[in-house]
């Protein structure tokens, strides 16, 4: 187990200042948050130019004397917009494309893993079918991530397909290579 701090823990500070604050706390590694509604890294910018974003982040992280522990992105705005288990095939394809950019970003920035949100329960589909969509989508994304040498994890949360610890365990067991971020 390693102690990390999220880059968005200091949302009122610029990204570089946030990293310096984390370093001042003697926390050796940062979890990079990339959220459309977040204060620093933006998923769309990573997708547009993963190399440039990785270079910018690497310089800032190195200047602060930190390591990178993980990338924690969202595909859309919040956990309900473009969730991993969307039943819409075109949105799922867009998510896969964005994930591939996240993978390139991580490889270039020296980030060893990506933590994703596990998906939502779709009222029209119910819990079981929503869970199965998450299993299918995450199986594909884990294969992509592992193919690039990255760890892929989920963060269980309320209002998700893995709201209960037993469901989080079931999803991790159902998707070969998937891990759990606490």
Where are these regions (language model features)?
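Active-site-proximal loop/turn and secondary-structure-junction residues that shape catalytic pockets
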Residues: 9-11, 34-36, 74-77, 118-122, ...
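Surface-exposed cleft-lining segments at the edges of enzyme active sites
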Residues: 85-91, 123-129, 154-159
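Short N-terminal helix-initiation segments at or just after the protein's N-terminus
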Residues: 5, 96, 122-128
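Acidic/histidine-rich catalytic cores of soluble enzymes
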Residues: 1, 19, 23, 30, ...
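N-terminal pre-domain/capping segments
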Residues: 1-112, 139, 146
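Active-site groove signature of glycoside hydrolases
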Residues: 106-126, 148-154
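Short alpha-helix boundary/capping motifs
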Residues: 49-51, 89-90, 123, 134-135, ...
């Amino acid at each position: 187990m390693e102690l990390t701090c999220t880059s968005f823990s200091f949302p009122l500070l610029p990204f570089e200042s946030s990293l310096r604050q984390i370093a001042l706390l003697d926390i050796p590694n940062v979890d990079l948050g990339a959220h459309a509604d977040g204060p620093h890294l933006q998923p769309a910018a990573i997708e547009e130019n993963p190399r440039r974003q990785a270079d910018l982040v690497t310089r800032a992280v190195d200047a602060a004397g930190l390591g990178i522990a993980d990338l924690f992105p969202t595909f859309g705005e919040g956990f309900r917009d473009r969730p991993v288990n969307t039943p819409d095939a075109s949105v799922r394809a867009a998510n896969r494309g964005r994930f591939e950019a996240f993978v390139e970003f991580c490889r270039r920035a020296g980030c060893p893993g990506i933590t994703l949100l596990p998906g939502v329960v779709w009222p029209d589909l119910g819990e079981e079918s929503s869970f199965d969509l998450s299993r299918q989508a995450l199986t594909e994304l884990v294969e992509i991530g592992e193919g690039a040498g990255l760890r892929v994890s989920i963060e269980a949360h309320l209002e998700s397909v893995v709201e209960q610890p037993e469901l989080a365990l079931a999803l991790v067991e159902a998707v070969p290579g998937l891990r759990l971020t606490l």
